[in-house]
């Protein structure tokens, strides 16, 4: 226990001796100017603003990519669920076939009238 006390006393003595050897800087003898301090401080704010801008830019890119992915998923889901485009195409095809069959029936009827054959029952 006494050895630990001697060691603590020795460390305290070394600390005090080093403190006395280093002279304190006087306010008037300081070589650093106010302008130098301000210039050094601006570097920190620039770095902070740069990091905030970088984060904002990266986050905006992420959100834009996410919106694009959501839009593509929405398009794929609407196409696979039979969206309005598919029904429109089917309706157009059915309408075209119906008009073709009506035209052909009318042509057959006119041809039958021209032939003058009696009605078959």
UniProtKB/Swiss-Prot annotation:
PROSITE patterns reported in the protein's UniProt record: GLUCAGON (PS00260)
Keyword Signal: yes
Keyword terms, alphabetized: Cleavage on pair of basic residues, Hormone, Secreted, Signal
Sequence similarity: Belongs to the glucagon family.
Gene Ontology CC annotation, any one: extracellular region
Residue(s) at site: Cleavage: 49-50, 87-88
The protein's name in its UniProt record: Pro-glucagon
InterPro entries according to UniProt: Glucagon (IPR015550), Glucagon_GIP_secretin_VIP (IPR000532)
Pfam families for the chain: Hormone_2 (PF00123)
Organism this protein belongs to: Carassius auratus
Source domain of life: Eukaryota
Gene3D superfamilies: 6.10.250.590
GO molecular function per UniProt: glucagon receptor binding; hormone activity
Signal peptide feature range: 1-21
Localization per record: Secreted
Residues excised as propeptide: 80-85
Gene assigned in the entry: gcg
GO biological process per UniProt: response to starvation
């Amino acid at each position: 226990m006494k050895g630990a006390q001697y060691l603590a006393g020795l460390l305290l003595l070394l600390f005090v001796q080093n403190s006395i050897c280093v002279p304190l800087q006087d306010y008037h003898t300081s070589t650093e100017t106010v302008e130098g301090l301000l210039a050094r401080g601006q570097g920190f704010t620039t770095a902070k603003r740069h990091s905030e801008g970088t984060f904002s830019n990266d986050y905006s890119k992420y959100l834009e990519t996410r919106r694009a992915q959501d839009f593509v998923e929405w398009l794929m889901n609407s196409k696979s669920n039979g969206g309005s485009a598919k029904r429109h195409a089917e309706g157009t095809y059915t309408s075209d076939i119906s008009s073709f069959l009506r035209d052909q029936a009318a042509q057959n009827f006119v041809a039958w009238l021209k032939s003058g054959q009696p009605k078959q029952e």
